[in-house]
Amino acid sequence: MKIAVIGLGNMGQPIARNVLQAGYELTVYNRTKQKTEDLVTEGAQAADTPRLAAKSADIVITMLADDDSVSTVTFGEDGLLEGLAENGIHISMSTISVEFSEKLAAAHAEKGQFFLAAPVLGRPDAAAKAALRIITAGPAEAKQAAKPLLDSLSQQIFDVGEESKTANAAKISINFLLVSMLEALSESFLMMEKYGLEQKQFLEIASALFGSPVYQNYGTIMAEQKFEPAGFKMSLGLKDTNLALAAAKRVSANLPLAELAKSHFESGIEKGFGDLDWAALIKCIK
């Protein structure tokens, strides 16, 4: 089976490498061609356009920042939609909006292709270890065909049905939970700091009670002030918070915590923190 990976950022690069290591023929595309060089050295082929990348593949994975980025590589004369063969599969591993997921599913169906939403849970280090968790939704035939590939990239797969938007809504909700935890952890750290307790010691207490890798990992980043290099940028945290608010509005749900986190992210970005890890939320509350 031939695979193409489009988007070689912090997540796309290790995902592409794991595709190679799993023994698949790999074609890669990235807007900045320099990012393809190491993978080409390791055995991948580089394509000049998304269309050419898709033309050489049975399955195309996109791992990009947002709706606009995925739209750019999918639609248009040089988009993957024009290159992918009938019955080909587009797997979007990006965090995209519910509405855009529906648009992609419809566009591929019109071409006789399959669209599979497969957003991931995990940071770049998890991607490098093929230890991501993946939420999938889409046609059963596509999920069955893609399962061996997704198994080679992950430690666990959650199948949430045949409508792609369900997987994207689930990922958006998970990210909202993470934002809520970052908000609560930041506020707790700052309060205890005023009572003279070091953040590392408070984290030890919290970790003993909750036993959550989220608290442990992000709490350590906060306590040690190691916000660079960013595993997930604050600007992307704001993007995902806005996605959560939009998804909630669509079904008349209220997310007051998301509104609060949004204001803090916006404040941080105004202060120049947009490229820091989103755990730098703690710097936005001080």
From Swiss-Prot:
One Pfam short name: NAD_binding_2
Entries under InterPro entries matching the protein: 6-PGluconate_DH-like_C_sf (IPR008927), 6PGD_dom2 (IPR013328), 6PGDH_NADP-bd (IPR006115), HIBADH-like_NADP-bd (IPR029154), HIBADH-related (IPR015815), HIBADH-related_NP60_sf (IPR051265), NAD(P)-bd_dom_sf (IPR036291)
Protein's UniProt name: Uncharacterized oxidoreductase YfjR
Entry's family note: Belongs to the HIBADH-related family.
GO BP field: organic acid catabolic process
Domain of life: Bacteria
Residues annotated as the enzyme's active site: 171
Broad enzyme group: oxidoreductase
Gene Ontology molecular function: NAD binding; NADP binding; oxidoreductase activity
